[in-house]
Amino acid sequence: MSAPKLSLCVEDTGYEIAFAGRSNAGKSSAINSLTNQKQLARASKKPGRTQMINFFSLGNPDQRLVDLPGYGYAAVPEDMKRIWQKELENYLIHRQSLQGLVLLMDIRHPLQHFDTMMLEWAHSRKLFVHILLTKADKLNRGPANQVLLDVKQTLKKMKLSFSIQLFSSLNKQGLEELASVMAGRLNYTLDKTLDFDLDAIPEATEDDLNDELMDQDETSEFNTENIDDHLDQEPKI
């Protein structure tokens, strides 16, 4: 099921884990890899249903994955950005079945402003968070591991004890680790036979698809200095 706003979402019962991140963080690709279904997140040239809250179950209607609209909305008009920021806020604050987040961040651009806001908010709600540094294949092993270490140190500075890993949907790096995390929270196994509701599947934006073709020589712009200004702020979305 897909819902344009909180009031139209599926019944607020059971257990949900939401996938969140910027619109170009590789969210659709990660979901496809996790579920072993290449077309789970179907491609689209328009934002369309990617600007909806998308629910689908892992064979059990009481255990759901939720694909949230990517924050950033690069190709979306300003009015729609404001509307969806409000709907995202409503979901995150009021959804009682929401038990945790998988937060996706491009390894070359981790801990952007909205990422830190999401982390602070999740901490304030006492949700579990598992962080994916996506597109790890874009960096060599040494630089990728350094970004992982830098982000861990920044999380420690922020007094956040969230789990974090490297991930690449292209070469499946970190897929088993992610599957293990999901298995610890849901009745989930990395299995091609899972029964998904394909009518309730989010579509990938053109921006998502184009981003997969970005120059692999691009280096990380991670800098802990831009985090300091947010450490003492009250969590908000």
Curated annotation (Swiss-Prot):
Keywords for the protein's UniProt record, in alphabetical order: Cell cycle, Cell division, GTP-binding, Magnesium, Metal-binding, Nucleotide-binding, Septation
Example GO biological process: division septum assembly
Residue span, EngB-type G domain: 13-188
Cofactor(s) of this protein: Mg(2+)
Highest taxon of the lineage: Bacteria
Residues involved in Mg(2+) binding: 28, 50
Lipoprotein keyword on record: no
Composition skew (Acidic residues), residue ranges: 207-220
Composition-biased stretches (Basic and acidic residues): 227-237
Gene3D superfamilies: P-loop containing nucleotide triphosphate hydrolases (3.40.50.300)
TM segment ranges: none
Pfam families cross-referenced by the UniProt entry: MMR_HSR1
GO cellular component assignments: cytosol
Residues that hold GTP according to the record: 21-28, 48-52, 67-70, 134-137, 167-169
Keyword check for Cell cycle: yes
Annotated segments matching region Disordered: 207-237
GO molecular function: GTP binding; metal ion binding
Cross-referenced CDD domains: YihA_EngB
HAMAP family cross-referenced by the UniProt entry: GTPase_EngB
Function: Necessary for normal cell division and for the maintenance of normal septation.
Family: Belongs to the TRAFAC class TrmE-Era-EngA-EngB-Septin-like GTPase superfamily. EngB GTPase family.
Protein name: Probable GTP-binding protein EngB
Lineage: Bacteria, Pseudomonadati, Pseudomonadota, Gammaproteobacteria, Moraxellales
